[in-house]
Amino acid sequence: MGVDLGDILSKKKISLENLSGCWIAVDGFNTLYQFLSIIRQPDGTPLMDASGRVTSHLSGLLYRMTNLIEVGIRVAFVFDGTPPELKAGTLAARAQMKEAAEIQLQEAIATGVDSFRYAQATARINSEILHDSIRLLDAMGIPYVQAPSEGEAQAAFMAIRGDVDYVASQDYDSLLFGAPRVVRNLAITGRRKMPRKNIYIDVPPEVIILEEELTRLGISREQLIDIGIMCGTDYNRGLPKVGPKRALKLIREHGCLEAVLDALGESIENFREIRELFLHPAVTESYELRMRKPMVDEIVGFLCNERNFSEDRVRKAAERLNASYRSGQSTLERWL
């Protein structure tokens, strides 16, 4: 889930139209997890084809990415590569949590208890889901980048270089990796039903500007990283009873994590390695950002013939995507 710094960061609500003409590097795994968790039937079951293969992610990619591209947003998906060794403990813990959620889900179904939240917690990305996602992105003409390690680090690197305007992720790790501008809620923007409630809320995109936040908080990026490490990251457990607000207070008082640990009489294993990982992550310069002409027949053939989607809905979405590509010549500088 990454580090939670939401309580100390200011987010600016914007509209999708504010992002028109921008390139956005999308945290691929984070976005697919959102689709797999949110796009579900009332009982919590994911969308599936006639063979029982999960298709929630494909629905999200087609319809929600088409909505973004229609308003002039250009997206590039960035997928994780080999995780850092420091992440092994977190990955093992996540696997255990999903196994526990599977057991709770079966118990909830057997007893008639609302199973939706347990079903959401079982979402997994396997090789088939990843392969199908990349296949659909190719057909839609959307570029994707394979990161050598952390996808958010690669996306942040692309933003630092100026190749993209924003990084899109629900997590705050992108800021620790140095992303100048992060947009949240990109894939879930709109009117959304609250789980297990007959209540709808509007979910707007939110933008966080790193330099503005550092200035407002009176800290450096290195100090923000130290705050994240104190709270807990994908690479370490946080200090007991230390959340983002207290961590900020401690950094302001003591200046750096070393001094905080000395003052509290605490320790965090490998914290210098973790700090270095955020400051100098493994990234690649080998990528190309170019929107291509959507292959309408390929989209329809894959989703309708192989994954049992409604041909009428899919074809309409694919034609909208194609129309956006054609009309983009006069309004977007980075189209072909």
UniProtKB/Swiss-Prot annotation:
Cofactor remark: Binds 2 magnesium ions per subunit. They probably participate in the reaction catalyzed by the enzyme. May bind an additional third magnesium ion after substrate binding.
Region (I-domain): 114-255
Any Gene Ontology biological process: DNA repair
InterPro entries: 5-3_exonuclease_C_sf, Flap_endonuc, Flap_endonuc_arc, HhH2, PIN-like_dom_sf, XPG-I_dom, XPG/Rad2, XPG_CS
Residues the entry annotates as binding Mg(2+) 1: D27, D80, E150, E152
Keywords noted in UniProt: DNA damage, DNA repair, DNA replication, Endonuclease, Exonuclease, Hydrolase, Magnesium, Metal-binding, Nuclease
Cofactor(s) needed for function: Mg(2+)
Domain of life: Archaea
GO terms, molecular function: 5'-3' exonuclease activity; 5'-flap endonuclease activity; DNA binding; magnesium ion binding
Residues that coordinate or bind Mg(2+) 2: D171, D173, D234
PROSITE patterns found in the cross-reference section: XPG_1 (PS00841)
Residue span of region N-domain: 1-98
SMART domains according to UniProt: HhH2 (SM00279), XPGI (SM00484), XPGN (SM00485)
EC number(s) from the headed UniProt entry: 3.1.-.-
Region (Interaction with PCNA): 328-336
Subunit structure and binding partners: Interacts with PCNA. PCNA stimulates the nuclease activity without altering cleavage specificity.
NCBIfam families to which the protein is assigned, alphabetical: fen_arch
Family from the record: Belongs to the XPG/RAD2 endonuclease family. FEN1 subfamily.
Function: Structure-specific nuclease with 5'-flap endonuclease and 5'-3' exonuclease activities involved in DNA replication and repair. During DNA replication, cleaves the 5'-overhanging flap structure that is generated by displacement synthesis when DNA polymerase encounters the 5'-end of a downstream Okazaki fragment. Binds the unpaired 3'-DNA end and kinks the DNA to facilitate 5' cleavage specificity. Cleaves one nucleotide into the double-stranded DNA from the junction in flap DNA, leaving a nick for ligation. Also involved in the base excision repair (BER) pathway.
UniProt-recorded name of the protein: Flap endonuclease 1
Organism: Methanothrix thermoacetophila (strain DSM 6194 / JCM 14653 / NBRC 101360 / PT)
